[in-house]
């Protein structure tokens, strides 16, 4: 009995610590990009995956202590995929007491009709889904649309565009929608996917898999995701450093003439951002920028539990 109590305390301690980190990450992103303002009505797009469940949970948590007032309405798009468990999300949201709307649109049928067997469905599916969500936001009077993309998604998009699109373009934490009528926010922009996964596992969210894209092998995004996970294991801190680089762009030291007036550089021009250091010896720090070793949570847990036992 005592052992079971210790396990429960350990799990609760880890969950509390993890939730605080996620809450801090979301709070910082909201503040840095002014994502949520007084009186906002946030349409939280809920797919049934770990990311959107976590986003809703953290936003609900922040709502209780935020210095501003804002409301949440969860929206799920039922795309009429075969075997989609229609009861799961309504039951979950009613239990939470969260306002919600289920939008039923047979985008699955459209995708299957338009896309040849074996081809990637993501692009068409995303466009259809986007249009429906924009329309729903208008109907609900939502001032912001919240999507569940996290830090890893943002980095993956950056590399996808570099490797396959030939451009430095990521996934912005806040943007104007394609139709120019809605503001889209990504509150999980600073959150690590592995933290979200651990949180979702601990909370035992009723996950609904995507039968359209989740079962498609060899997607380019999956290749990039595997590469980043490998780097994260072999080179601790590299992911943090790359994300930090996205927040510290130096246009004068790239090659885009739209971002910097290279033609305007003449004799007598000011030195910009340190000038050219190409011939200087590079001073590389021993540890990547913005990296901190992860806490040994097992040791912390054991220490805390031992203190509890002594008392």
UniProtKB/Swiss-Prot annotation:
* Broad enzyme group: transferase
Q: Which reaction does it catalyse?
A: cytidine(32) in tRNA + S-sulfanyl-L-cysteinyl-[cysteine desulfurase] + AH2 + ATP = 2-thiocytidine(32) in tRNA + L-cysteinyl-[cysteine desulfurase] + A + AMP + diphosphate + H(+)
Binding-site positions, [4Fe-4S] cluster: 122, 125, 213
| Gene Ontology BP annotations | tRNA modification; tRNA thio-modification
| Names of required cofactors | [4Fe-4S] cluster; Mg(2+)
Where do we find the motif PP-loop motif here? 47-52
Q: Which GO terms describe its cellular component?
A: cytosol
Recorded GO terms, molecular function? 4 iron, 4 sulfur cluster binding; ATP binding; magnesium ion binding; protein homodimerization activity; sulfurtransferase activity; tRNA binding
Give the pathway: tRNA modification
In the record's cofactor note, how is the cofactor described as bound? Binds 1 [4Fe-4S] cluster per subunit. The cluster is chelated by three Cys residues, the fourth Fe has a free coordination site that may bind a sulfur atom transferred from the persulfide of IscS. The [4Fe-4S] cluster is highly sensitive to oxygen and prone to decompose into the [2Fe-2S] form and further degraded forms.
Q: Null-mutant phenotype, please?
A: Loss of cytidine thiolation in position 32 in tRNA.
The alphabetized UniProt keywords are: 4Fe-4S, ATP-binding, Cytoplasm, Iron, Iron-sulfur, Magnesium, Metal-binding, Nucleotide-binding, RNA-binding, Transferase, tRNA processing, tRNA-binding
Could you tell me the EC number(s) of this protein?
2.8.1.-
Q: Which domain of life is it from?
A: Bacteria
Q: Briefly state the protein's biological role.
A: Catalyzes the ATP-dependent 2-thiolation of cytidine in position 32 of tRNA, to form 2-thiocytidine (s(2)C32). The sulfur atoms are provided by the cysteine/cysteine desulfurase (IscS) system.
Q: Which NCBIfam families match?
A: PRK10696.1 (NF007972)
What more the UniProt record tells us is: The thiolation reaction likely consists of two steps: a first activation step by ATP to form an adenylated intermediate of the target base of tRNA, and a second nucleophilic substitution step of the sulfur (S) atom supplied by the hydrosulfide attached to the Fe-S cluster.
Q: Which family does it belong to?
A: Belongs to the TtcA family.
Q: What is this protein called?
A: tRNA-cytidine(32) 2-sulfurtransferase
Q: Which gene encodes it?
A: ttcA
